[in-house]
């Protein structure tokens, strides 16, 4: 039986009120076509999980069952086309997930700067779609931060190298590790903010290449080696943009990808589709995860097919969305990416839109954002 079939059967039991019963956690009830343990075993195989003692196994099994139930609730509540279910994080509590993969809660005060909206933004039309992934050699491959809480550094590095490739027509892959080792607050893998990354680049007069200064994560003590390697990219400044989504879309289409910081709560259970959350299910004020905004689009109207967690079909309305690049590897979400509804500040996507300023000394043909 496939994993999908296993989950489907288990969730039938779950919805019938039997999913979390003791009979699924023990063998006292006699043989069943499917037990929670069997589903959990497949999860362990798929994501290479093992637990050091029976008590820990039982605890993780209970968390896994709770998370599948939570994913089912999210599936029913979401107003978009998102599908929720089993992910690499399904054996973690919500608190553990936040501690392992989020950053510190972003402060209300940011570096002393003025929000910038170009004067020619207002009144100009925004293209219907924009996807920088389709432009040749602009967006790098999806990285995996692992157990290092460095989403802020990876998002900023992705922003800088994408803009450098657009402005200079030069392929560069900049060092995330340099940002971790040389960050002004010395937090390294313990979290940070994207503006810390930009200030580090300015203080060090640029960044070395990923090849010269490779990512090590939390596998070694952080020792700044910024002066040891040649700089391959640098910035003139960085800017916090307006929180107007129309202005953000225009800036993104004209200039290139930008960093945003969101509430990552729903990403623990996310598989694919457009997340259209409510403020109660994803508080836009509590942002804790930085990612790269690479494009936007609009889903066509139609019928959404049933999912593993919900076999019922529902009307799919035309939904505008953002395309975001994550740092949890290409096997998560939509090949390392995810989509958020565009137009209502879903999960706080407009709270901290930041971008580097990378200017080219030579006038070259502009690379436009592919539709």
UniProtKB/Swiss-Prot annotation:
Disulfide bonds join 148-189, 182-224, 282-347. SUPFAM superfamilies: Cysteine proteinases. It comes from the Eukaryota. Residues 1-21 form the signal peptide. Glycans are attached at residues 48, 112, 203, 344. Residues 22-125 form a propeptide. GO terms for molecular function: cysteine-type peptidase activity. Keywords: Disulfide bond, Endoplasmic reticulum, Glycoprotein, Hydrolase, Protease, Signal, Thiol protease, Zymogen. CDD domains: Peptidase_C1A. Its main location: endoplasmic reticulum. GO terms for biological process: proteolysis. The keyword Cytoplasm does not apply. InterPro entries: Papain-like_cys_pep_sf, Pept_asp_AS, Pept_his_AS, Peptidase_C1A, Peptidase_C1A_C, Peptidase_C1A_papain-like, Prot_inhib_I29. The keyword Chaperone does not apply. It is found in: Endoplasmic reticulum. Belongs to the peptidase C1 family. This is Cathepsin W. The gene is Ctsw.
């Amino acid at each position: 039986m496939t994993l999908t079939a296993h989950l489907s059967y288990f969730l039938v039991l779950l919805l019938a009120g039997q999913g979390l019963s003791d009979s699924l956690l023990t063998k006292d009830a006699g043989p069943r076509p499917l037990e929670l343990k069997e589903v959990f075993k497949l999860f362990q195989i798929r994501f290479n999980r093992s637990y050091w003692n029976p008590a820990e196994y039982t605890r993780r099994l209970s968390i896994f069952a709770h998370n599948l139930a939570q994913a089912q609730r999210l599936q029913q509540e979401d107003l978009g086309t998102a599908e929720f279910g089993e992910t690499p994080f399904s054996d973690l509590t919500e608190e553990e997930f936040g501690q392992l993969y989020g950053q510190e809660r972003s402060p209300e005060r940011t570096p002393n700067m003025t929000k910038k909206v170009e004067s020619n933004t207002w009144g100009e039309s925004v293209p219907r779609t924009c996807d920088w992934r389709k432009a040749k050699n602009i967006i790098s491959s999806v990285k995996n931060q692992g157990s290092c809480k460095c989403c802020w550094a990876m998002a900023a590095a992705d922003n800088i190298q994408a803009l450098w490739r657009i402005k200079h027509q030069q392929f560069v892959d900049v060092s995330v590790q340099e940002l971790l080792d040389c960050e002004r607050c010395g937090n390294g893998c313990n979290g940070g903010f994207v503006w810390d990354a930009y200030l580090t680049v300015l203080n060090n007069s640029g960044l070395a290449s990923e090849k010269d200064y490779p990512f090590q994560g939390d596998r070694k003590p952080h020792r700044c080696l910024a002066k040891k390697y040649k700089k391959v990219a640098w910035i003139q400044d960085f800017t916090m943009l307006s929180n107007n989504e129309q202005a953000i879309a225009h800036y993104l289409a004209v200039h290139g990808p930008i960093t945003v910081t969101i509430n990552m709560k729903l990403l623990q259970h996310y598989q694919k589709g457009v997340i259209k959350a409510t403020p109660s299910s994803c508080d836009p004020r509590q942002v804790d995860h930085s990612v790269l905004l690479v494009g936007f689009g609009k889903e066509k109207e139609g019928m959404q097919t049933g999912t593993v967690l919900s076999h019922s079909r529902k009307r799919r309305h035309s939904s505008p969305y953002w395309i975001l690049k994550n740092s949890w590897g290409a096997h998560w979400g939509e090949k390392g990416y995810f989509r958020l509804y565009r137009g209502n500040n879903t999960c706080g996507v407009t709270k901290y839109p930041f971008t580097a300023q990378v200017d080219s000394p030579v006038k070259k043909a502009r690379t436009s954002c592919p539709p």
